[in-house]
């Protein structure tokens, strides 16, 4: 408790040194005015006293606000020592190398394991690029919107102040920087705590790594941070990146930034460790956000954060739209659902990004949103509501169009197609109802179901009519032929009648009979009325006659009398 009070008093004394000097000036002016008796001199001294007094009041109010907000002084980060010789192996410490710092020479232990593990982090290292050198700057030469971000006493990255369409001011930086538990903003040696500030928008994609944080206005005003505007990057633009060891020891580097796709930027600008989240400035406007390096390609990488806000159309206002028009003539254009499908059929690959729950798909020069594809897939109907989103209670007004088949239409106040079957069989007389003029049925499925039901009923009625007419009609030719066939003798035998046995067939032929001997001709068929077929009774008569003739031709055993007659 006592330590915290002493620390606060010390910080108040450090920040109030200018106020004490102003108060001393006021006292000296007042004493000089008291020792003079000349009215003009007294008037001049009074004006001077009022000016100094106003100066003191303003300084005291500013220091009081800083004290309330918890403003503290930035801890100056010492410059690193430089290695001036080759590392050698020491059995006691491992690899050591001679270094120099502040004019003094000493040995530095080199942690080889830490260096090897750090070298595997390909996406977070920074790179020095050819023809892009770091230039030292004074803190007053840096952009007004640039701030340093601290995690307690450790510099984690950089950010900037931008304004949204609602007038709210936001902190823009890289998401991986914000995830290091940023606790303070720092500008010109002063730090302001910002713990607990809410996130407005963010994207965790490696190519679109940014976060938008809502910071109170008094925090910006205490540090004297200005507001920057967002502009869309051209296809190839010269940009400047700022960074440093702290908010007072800063550097800048200039190079060329190019677009790889609507969201991905590659820069040929030299950066060092701790520069992540630093804006890419082009003529005092922010056109990108530095993320890290791509060692395999020898370039640094950044994101086109202005394009992200332009696509989602909220959070931040993007200015200077003529640099990146929405028309098809621009370097990147928005696709509709039909064109997007054509691009997929052509084999063009799209990269998917997620910006605060909004899905965006981009190719090298084109982009679209999942919401636009969904809206195009489900076009609203006449009621203004998408068909897929309509409820069972919702009703849609449809145009009345008669169907193109006989007696089509539904009656008012009745189920669809329930009364289309208007014919009934009444003692062979068909009664037909009037033909409706229009069909007021809404669902097409109901119409088809009713039509199928009607066809089934009509088929059943026709079948019943045909069956009744075949049983009851007495004048048709078919009935007369049927009666005549029933009057003839039938070849079918009663169940109790035994089957007639055929005479046994002789196994040897008569010597007197010739092989060509024919039996008696069958009885001639009696001619009946034309068109009448032979009856089964006539066939049975012929079969009995043929059996009798066959039994007469079988001779008895040969005798000598017949043999002598033959020889004669």
UniProtKB/Swiss-Prot annotation:
Residues 481-502 have a biased composition (Basic and acidic residues). PROSITE patterns: PEPTIDASE_S39 (PS51868). GO terms for biological process: proteolysis; viral translational frameshifting. Keywords: Covalent protein-RNA linkage, Host membrane, Hydrolase, Membrane, Phosphoprotein, Protease, Serine protease, Transmembrane, Transmembrane helix. Pfam families: Peptidase_S39. The record marks 130-131, 319-320, 397-398, 499-500 as: Cleavage. The active site is at residues 176, 209, 276. Residues 539-549 have a biased composition (Basic residues). The modification Phosphothreonine is found at residue 339. The keyword Transmembrane applies. Residues 129-326 form the Peptidase S39 domain. The record marks 324 as: Interacts with viral RNA (covalent). One of its GO terms (cellular component) is membrane. InterPro entries: Peptidase_S1_PA, Peptidase_S1_PA_chymotrypsin, Peptidase_S39B_luteovirus. The modification Phosphoserine is found at residue 390. SUPFAM superfamilies: Trypsin-like serine proteases (SSF50494). The chain crosses the membrane at residues 10-30, 41-61. One of its GO terms (molecular function) is serine-type endopeptidase activity. It comes from the Viruses. Residues 403-435, 469-568 are annotated as: Disordered. Residues 419-435, 469-478, 507-516, 554-568 have a biased composition (Polar residues). Its EC number is 3.4.21.-. This is Polyprotein P2A.
